[in-house]
Amino acid sequence: MRYALLIASAIALLLSSTPILLADETVSIGGSNAVLLRPTAPRASVILMPGGDGYIAAGPGGTIGKLKGNQLVRTRNAYLARGLAVLVVGADVNLARAVDYMAAIKRPVTVVATSKGTLRVAHGIAGGAKPDTLVLTSGFLTDGSGSRQNVANILGSPRLLPRTLVVAHRYDSCRFTLPAGVEPFIRWAGGKASFKWLDGGTDSGDPCQARGHHGFNGLDSEVVSAAAGFH
């Protein structure tokens, strides 16, 4: 009898610590499709904004047709496994509406953007989006990153910037997201931003694509751990 009770207790503990997941679904945010993944009882929400042209080709039933190799797209289920409600958005989704949508599911809402997605999130925040926190990975941060198009220049001042985490690879060789842009961004943010350096992993192919250090190839768990824990 005692053994049976111990087994029952262990099963109950396992079930209570494992999030119950709903089926992936395609949802409309202001007329644009996005992909929603969520547990029945999320502890927080994340909005994932991939790089490149930003178009994920969200199809029926939560399918994603493009940018499947993008670091944020390929790790979306890892955020879900951590008990987070996850919204993967394309470039055509209005960020302010996306934040409001996820806030209705569970706050805090963290936007995680990578590469060119960091430009889109900056425009979204400048346009009125108000996430609780922000994570920028392989970001177009400052002029030191290698491009005049960057988060600091788009926002102009850190007044609208939420609490922010920068995740960067020490050896990112993409000419638009160079490591040299990180420390100037931290100074510009005036106490609103912190940073995490990663190194290691595998570097191959185009230095601005997902298989290089720019895309944290081989370091997905480290990126997810940092981003999912920042809220």
PLM segments and residue spans:
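The feature captures the conserved acid-bearing segment of alpha/beta-hydrolase catalytic domains
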Residues: 139-200
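Bacterial N-terminal signal peptides
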Residues: 8-17
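C-terminal catalytic histidine-bearing segment of alpha/beta-hydrolase fold enzymes
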Residues: 192-231
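Short, surface-exposed "cap/lid" segments of acyl-processing enzymes
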Residues: 40-78
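N-terminal cap/lid segment of alpha/beta-hydrolase-fold proteins
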Residues: 22-41
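A conserved short beta-strand
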Residues: 129-143
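Gly/Ala-rich beta-loop-alpha elbow adjacent to hydrolase catalytic centers
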Residues: 112-121
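Alpha/beta-hydrolase active-site loop
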Residues: 70-72, 88-106
